[in-house]
Amino acid sequence: MFQFCLFLVLLTLGRINSALGSNHESDAAENREGSGGLPVCRENAICAFLQQNAIDSKVTPLPTCTCSGGNTCSESWNEDGKSLTMGSKQFKFCSNVPESVKHNCDAEEKAFTAIFEEDKETKKHLAYYGFLHCICPEDSDYVEIDKPEKEEGDKLIRTENFRCEKLKTCGANDRCHSLAIGGDRQIVYRECNCPEGKQCPFDPESAYDTEHKVTTTDYTTYLMRCQ
């Protein structure tokens, strides 16, 4: 199951092949039209993703593209008309949230589209664009529907479409979530919901296992089971 939060974190850090097993690997995005190594946003693309840390309520901002035309992308948690909140997550837009997004996702509806551009020969990552189509419930995750590819000149364009799927109830040996901590970034990767009477811990000392990966930032991932 694709987990959107961590995917965006490691894209922003410059490497999508994460400690949690995402399949994409890339160098830092480069696009001369943008700033900070990010491409210029396409119309209606999300410009940033925020997650509120369950440990200390700190907000981690993850910019994905650069706004143009005098627009700016807020990296603060707020309700400014350009933000869409889903539980502990907030998606940011360069302008007002598109009206077409403001509804709950149906079971088979396309919920999110991710577009990757890379150099056809070198496989170097060039750009990423994310598009919300509807609102996923907080207890849901994104499941891939399809992944078409096409070539445009010297670029390979990969489009990945996702729908919402309700998180299952954790079994006795299931990982309920993983806590990825690197530098000042702390991101939760949810995998299932704990059964009644149990909770998924956030204290790193409660982890049953740890993994350490180096991207452009050192990341330690703490793997948790329900307690």
Swiss-Prot record:
Chief place where the protein resides: secreted
Keyword set, alphabetical order: Disulfide bond, Secreted, Signal, Toxin
Signal peptide as annotated in the record: 1-21
Location(s), subcellular: Secreted
GO CC terms in record: extracellular region
Post-translational modification: Contains 8 disulfide bonds.
GO molecular function: toxin activity
Tissues and organs where the protein is expressed, per its UniProt entry: Expressed by the venom gland.
Family of this protein: Belongs to the scoloptoxin-11 family.
The protein's name: U-scoloptoxin(11)-Sm6a
Organism: Scolopendra morsitans (Tanzanian blue ringleg centipede)
